[in-house]
Amino acid sequence: LHLAAVFACNFVNHLYVLGGELLEKEGIDARLLLPLIDETAAKVHDMSPLAAQTGPAVRYDENVIQKQLAQLEADPTKREIYALMSQSIHQHSKS
């Protein structure tokens, strides 16, 4: 249970931190993500997380993925996390 909670809560919270850093670097208030965060969390009450997953990795939108990886060129850690998460999302969406 603890390991699952680390993935479902601790890691997700850290992704909020990373997303906030990306916005704040551009002078954008990270609180703008709150409606999306709330909507995403609410969806899993009505459908599985797998069914609720959206985004370029699910669609395998290679143009968007490559553009966003390029935007992360100066931050290898975020770039690696983005690539690994995108790959995992894509693999799970095919199942």
Describe the role of every protein-language-model region.
Residues V64-Q66, A70-S95:
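Long, low-complexity C-terminal extensions of enzymes
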